[in-house]
């Protein structure tokens, strides 16, 4: 037994000596030019690595620094900078034949800068394109015949920006990417994860490849994508100036043939805000969508976008164009018979401000809105209609007290305003909102028709005619044969004011004088106090 033990001990000792001695006997820095040349040839970019060291136990060569140049059309700064690069090698060929056969690559703690120019071209588009590597042969632009069993990026930082510098770069931390059986000429599995701006998470699991030899960004992809707690304000999905904010979860798929990308899935948003002066919605919003995106043209088609807010359902279809710094859209929003109770908590997100202390209750809302133009100058036109609803906590009758004084009719009581129907044509633009052909029927009061505007600061400027119920006689003649009283609506949406339009009343008074004063005399007799209000002297008592 003892001789066997001694032999084993000697073998172990020799192995230990070899493990310790070989790194000193082999100067792996001699292979640095070969490693740099191999990586530069594969990527089509100049690659530099730092001091090399050999680890027998892990079977790898480690560089204490890695730098990959950017496309000079984008930046003179490195595209990738990393503190460490581990290159897995076959030890036997390296030790006995001094041949460097790479089996796997691990890039640790890299900082990667992703840039997009005004034409939608990315700085990584030329990765792998031999024509972009001055040190490579200029006679061929075909992809390099490179295969790596394992390619990993660990704890990376990706910075997403544009060459114009108009937007603040977006940073994605803790990026991990795992690729197996990588090849430029075939499909390979990819698993990736990242921490999103604002603390959310991203996971991608799928397949990519073969690498497009002309434009890497057009490489085919099939993947499942999951996002959790995406911060819409801090993401790069929309321009921050648009005021979109909230948190979103996404579960869906992404597929691309290198020409057309197709995305489908479900987006669930909470605390959603859609305009700069809006406030977070009190209800979650779910969007089930399908779209197709032309990767070269930077345009797309939204074939489905079903927006659910509680039991309310609206549908969006249309197209978009992402060329340039601002995305333009041409969409149609259609919703029929949507419960107002489910929509009410969404109004703040749209910047809709109701009178202080009030809220919409009951009834249904229908609408059809077409939106056209760049997102920062979007113009939306269409119509809205609401039926059998109520504005709780707001008594319109009491606000019309000045108008009621003309009629001698007491203002309606109660704390709510019941709305039988409300319809209007709508135009929304950055300079404000305009309502035309406004028609509101309120059983306790009558009806209101007219038009007006709401400024970006929510100031009201409406000219309407109040057709108050139970009013006729002389007042009918004053209104030109109808029972309407001209009313000016001012103030703000949170505190509206309603006053008789004295200019219109004066115009009608002049018409009465032109008729010999006959109609005006009848009016002032039938409507107590109206003569004094219009400046007509009362007859001697």
Task: Name the predicted role of every residue range.
Residues 84-91:
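N-terminal post-signal-peptidase region of extra-cytosolic proteins
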Residues 127-144:
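Intrinsically disordered, low-complexity linkers and terminal tails enriched in Pro/Gly
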Residues 130-135, 413-415, 480-482, 532-541:
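Low-complexity, charge- and small-residue-enriched intrinsically disordered regions
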Residues 502-541:
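Gram-negative outer-membrane assembly/targeting C-terminal domains
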């Amino acid at each position: 037994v003892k001789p066997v033990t001694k032999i084993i001990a000697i073998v172990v000792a020799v192995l230990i000596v070899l493990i310790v001695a070989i790194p000193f006997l082999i100067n792996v820095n001699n292979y640095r030019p070969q490693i740099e040349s191999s990586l530069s040839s594969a990527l089509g970019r100049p690659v530099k690595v730092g001091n090399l060291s050999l680890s027998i136990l892990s079977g790898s060569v480690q560089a204490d620094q890695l730098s990959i140049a950017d496309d000079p059309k984008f930046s003179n700064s490195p595209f990738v900078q990393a503190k460490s690069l581990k290159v897995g090698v076959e030890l036997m060929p390296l030790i006995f034949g001094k041949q460097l056969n790479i089996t796997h690559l691990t890039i640790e703690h890299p900082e990667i800068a992703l840039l997009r120019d005004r034409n939608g071209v990315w700085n990584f588009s030329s990765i792998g394109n031999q024509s972009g590597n001055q040190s490579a042969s200029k006679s061929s632009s075909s992809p390099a015949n490179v295969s790596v069993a394992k390619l990993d990026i660990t704890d990376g930082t990706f910075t997403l920006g544009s060459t114009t510098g108009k937007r603040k770069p977006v940073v994605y931390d803790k990026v991990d990417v795992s690729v197996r059986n990588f090849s430029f000429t075939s499909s390979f599995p990819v698993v990736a994860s990242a921490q999103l701006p604002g603390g959310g998470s991203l996971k991608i699991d799928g397949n990519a490849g073969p690498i497009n030899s002309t434009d890497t960004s057009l490489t085919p992809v099939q993947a499942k994508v999951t996002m959790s707690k995406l911060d819409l304000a801090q993401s790069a999905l929309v321009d921050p100036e648009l005021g979109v904010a909230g948190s979103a979860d996404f579960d869906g798929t992404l597929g691309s043939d290198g020409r057309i990308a197709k995305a489908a899935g479900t987006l669930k948003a909470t605390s959603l805000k859609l305009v700069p002066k809006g406030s977070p919605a009190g209800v979650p919003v779910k969007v089930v969508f399908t779209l197709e995106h032309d990767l070269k043209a930077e345009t797309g088609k939204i074939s489905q976008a079903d927006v659910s807010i509680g039991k309310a359902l609206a549908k969006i279809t249309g197209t978009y164009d992402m060329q340039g710094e601002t995305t333009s859209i041409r969409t149609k929003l259609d919703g029929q018979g949507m419960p107002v109770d489910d929509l009410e908590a969404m109004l703040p997100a749209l910047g809709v401000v109701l009178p202080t202390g009030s809220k919409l209750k009951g009834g249904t809302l229908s609408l059809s809105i077409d939106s056209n133009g760049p997102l920062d100058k979007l113009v939306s036109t269409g119509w809205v209609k609401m039926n059998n609803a109520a504005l709780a906590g707001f008594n319109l009758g009491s606000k019309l007290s000045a108008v009621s004084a003309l009629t001698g009719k007491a203002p309606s009581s109660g704390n709510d305003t019941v709305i039988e129907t409300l319809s209007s044509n709508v135009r929304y633009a950055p300079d404000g909102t305009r309502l035309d052909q406004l028609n509101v029927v309120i059983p306790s009061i009558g009806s209101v028709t007219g038009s007006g505007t709401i400024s970006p600061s929510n100031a009201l400027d409406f000219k309407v005619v109040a057709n108050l119920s139970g009013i006729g006689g002389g007042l009918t003649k004053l209104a030109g044969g109808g029972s309407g009283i001209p009313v000016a609506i001012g103030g703000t949406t949170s505190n509206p004011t309603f006053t008789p339009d004295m200019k219109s009343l004066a115009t009608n008074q002049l018409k009465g004088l032109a008729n010999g004063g006959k109609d005006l005399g009848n009016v002032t007799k039938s409507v107590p106090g109206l003569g004094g209000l219009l400046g007509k002297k009362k007859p001697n008592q």
